[in-house]
Curated annotation (Swiss-Prot):
HAMAP family referenced in this protein's UniProt entry, alphabetically: IspD
Keyword Transferase: yes
PANTHER family (UniProt xref): 2-C-METHYL-D-ERYTHRITOL 4-PHOSPHATE CYTIDYLYLTRANSFERASE, CHLOROPLASTIC
SUPFAM superfamilies xref list: Nucleotide-diphospho-sugar transferases
Species of origin: Dechloromonas aromatica (strain RCB)
Protein name: 2-C-methyl-D-erythritol 4-phosphate cytidylyltransferase
Length: 228
C-alpha cells in the first residue's frame, strides 16, 4: 500500500515580508511560524515522515526546540535557489525510503493554518487518482488585468478559475520526473501540467492562507486561536 510523505521547502528569505529574519521563523502565538505548519503534518497519522528543506547556511533553525514535533521530522540542508530546486533536492533526500508509487505532499512553510480536515479531504479524493492533485479554492473576487500604466486593461472572467494552495500531492516517481524536466515552475502542479497531465482540484478553505505580508500573520493568529 502506498505511503505518504511530506516535503516542506523552507529555504526562502521571505523578502516581501520585510522582516529582520525569514518569515518562517517569525513569532506566531509564541512559536516560529513554521512550527505550526510542521505540527499539522507531523500530527497526521497518515504521514510517515516530514522533510524540511533548509538553506545550507540557515542560522535560525538550531535556535528553536523542535522536539515536540516528534520523530517524524527530518531536516536536510539542501535548499536551492528556487522552489523547484529545493523540492527536487528534498525528493532526492527521500530516495532511501520512498518508492515511486508512494505519495509526496509538498506544503508551503508559510501556510501554518492547514487543518486535519483539509488533509483528510486530500487523502480521500486522491487515494485512487492516477495523477494526484492539490488543495485549491474557487476564485471569488472579480479579477482585473492591469495595463502598463496600472489602469484596468480588462476584466477577466473568473468562471472556472481556482486559486492554488498547498499541500500539492503527487506520486514520488512522477513528481521527481516532472521537476527534472520543468525547473521554471512556481508550484508542483505546474510541473505535472507541463508533462501533459491534469492534477485534480480538491476544494480547500480560505483559512489555509499563505503568510506573505504582516497583516497575514495577524490573521493566521486569529485562525489558530479560534481552533483552540
Amino acid at each position: 500500500m502506498p505511503r505518504h510523505y511530506a516535503i516542506v521547502p523552507a529555504a526562502g528569505s521571505g523578502s516581501r515580508f520585510g522582516a529582520e529574519k525569514p518569515k518562517q521563523y517569525l513569532d506566531l502565538l509564541g512559536r516560529p511560524l513554521i512550527f505550526h505548519t510542521l505540527a499539522a503534518l507531523t500530527a497526521s497519522p497518515d504521514i510517515e515522515r516530514v522533510w524540511v528543506v533548509l538553506a545550507p547556511d540557515d542560522p535560525w533553525w538550531p535556535r528553536y526546540d523542535w522536539s515536540e514535533l516528534g520523530s517524524k521530522l527530518e531536516t536536510v540542508r539542501c535548499g536551492g535557489a528556487t522552489r523547484a530546486e529545493s523540492v527536487s533536492n528534498g525528493l532526492r533526500a527521500a530516495a532511501m525510503v520512498a518508492a515511486d508509487d508512494d505519495w509526496v505532499l509538498v506544503h508551503d512553510a508559510a501556510r501554518p493554518c492547514l487543518s486535519a480536515a483539509m488533509l483528510d479531504a486530500l487523502f480521500a479524493e486522491l487515494a485512487s487518482d492516477p495523477v494526484g492533485g492539490i488543495l485549491a479554492v474557487p476564485v471569488a473576487d472579480t479579477l482585473k488585468r492591469a495595463d502598463a500604466e496600472q489602469r484596468v486593461g480588462a476584466t477577466e472572467p473568473r468562471d472556472g478559475l481556482w486559486q492554488a494552495q498547498t499541500p500539492q500531492m503527487f506520486r514520488y516517481g512522477l513528481l521527481g520526473e516532472a521537476l527534472e524536466k520543468c525547473r521554471d515552475v512556481t508550484d508542483e502542479a505546474g510541473a505535472i501540467e507541463a508533462v501533459g497531465l491534469k492534477p485534480k482540484l480538491v476544494r480547500g478553505d480560505s483559512t489555509n492562507l499563505k503568510v506573505t505580508y504582516p497583516a497575514d500573520l495577524a490573521l493566521a493568529a486569529m485562525i489558530l486561536r479560534a481552533r483552540k
